[in-house]
């Protein structure tokens, strides 16, 4: 069976894509655990902030996380399927009406807050349903 070049590339990309990615949206506050290798040592560094953008699709999908530390705005772009990302934790789910939150770059203090989504935390909601159905 002869496969086309694009079919071969797609197959290779699907093999390299992570399957266990935590679902998150724009506006969510996340904690990204990154593996850092220095010589023969490996450690995990945590970067927490608000997701302000998601771009691309497939293996080349990226997301940007913005945070303010010591009065300075910091932004970092991560490859979603990178082997360097150990895990992504969703701390708080945000309710926004934009697909890109670049306006947060120039804000500080209360102006940089994102409204919390009502009825959020899907995982805790599932636990509540199990408790209610058990009674």
Swiss-Prot record:
InterPro entries found in the cross-reference section: Ribosomal_bL19 (IPR001857), Ribosomal_bL19_CS (IPR018257), Ribosomal_bL19_sf (IPR038657), Translation_prot_SH3-like_sf (IPR008991)
One Gene Ontology term, aspect cellular component: cytosolic large ribosomal subunit
Keyword Transferase: no
A GO biological process held by the record: translation
Keyword terms: Ribonucleoprotein, Ribosomal protein
GO MF annotation list: structural constituent of ribosome
Keyword Ribosomal protein in annotation: yes
Function recorded in the entry: This protein is located at the 30S-50S ribosomal subunit interface and may play a role in the structure and function of the aminoacyl-tRNA binding site.
Family from the record: Belongs to the bacterial ribosomal protein bL19 family.
Record-given protein name: Large ribosomal subunit protein bL19
Protein species of origin: Protochlamydia amoebophila (strain UWE25)
Gene: rplS
